[in-house]
Amino acid sequence: MQEAAKISHKENFRLIDLSYSVKDTFLEDVAKGLSAKKKYLLPKYFYDLKGSQLFDQICETNEYYPTRTEESILRLAIKDILKCSGDITDIIELGSGSSTKTKILLKNYLRKFKVIRYYPIDVSQILITTSNRLKKEFPRLNIITIISEYLEALKYIKKNVKEPKLFVFLGSSIGNYEKKGIHSLLRSLSSAMSKNDMMLIGMDMKKDQNVLEAAYNDKKGITAKFNLNMLQHINDELEGNFDLKKFIHHSFFNEKESRIEMHLVSEQDQSVRINGFRKLFKLRKGESIHTENSFKFTEKIIKELFNASGLKEKKKWMDNKKYFSLRMVTKK
């Protein structure tokens, strides 16, 4: 796709919008998901403003270990990561989010180098707000914010950003895809990488089922609010008429697929209307809408995925419990 959508410049800040009409895409994705035999919604639509705030609250719960564990690994390994990445000064981050962990990277890279170019990529317009905050916190940082789906952004990066560069994919966000999707995205990343590029990727490891399920069913019910908020997001943006009181949050570990699944279960027979569609979307009592996966990795699976994607692990860092891993990989 052409970079024709929107480009704006400020001092040390550039915005590149490669997205199609966000509302049209949202509408198409929702209609497709609710029309499927097994209903689903895409997890990228969790993150409106309220959803992003709720996710930040989830990260503060006692049960949700991934964020604090990855952050602790990052703090302990940062000198090693800097050494490993050599003279790289271009950092491309997929799914920047609130950039809390990213700040650890940026702060330390800016201590080592006078100039750093940072390319955060996300489909959400909230990324613009996050980028502006980073610009205030790190005035020397050159920020090129890319509003886009990952695949389009990777094409842009491959064409416009010279090697060497560091791709960053934290939070085990790669695990939100189906296994085939994980493989496909890793292959796309590998294709976007040059021989001197590197990628720092966070991967959540398979562990005790009770620990996993507690992380996605916190006692305060914040994860439930986060899950239900996707329906509110549809109501707000697409003029849907979901009644959130008629759904309950349900998440569990699917051993066969090695993943946590999050669902919204209909508590009664009901019909939902989305503005722009004459069709009513019907749900039976007990029927669920699958909203998210969170794949949990093993060393064997990681090795297979990297090999099949043309990637090679250079180094890894883990916490003492081996709950989570950070891995530096290169192209084969």
Locate the predicted segments by residue.
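Class I SAM-dependent methyltransferase Rossmann-like catalytic core
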Residues: 38-85
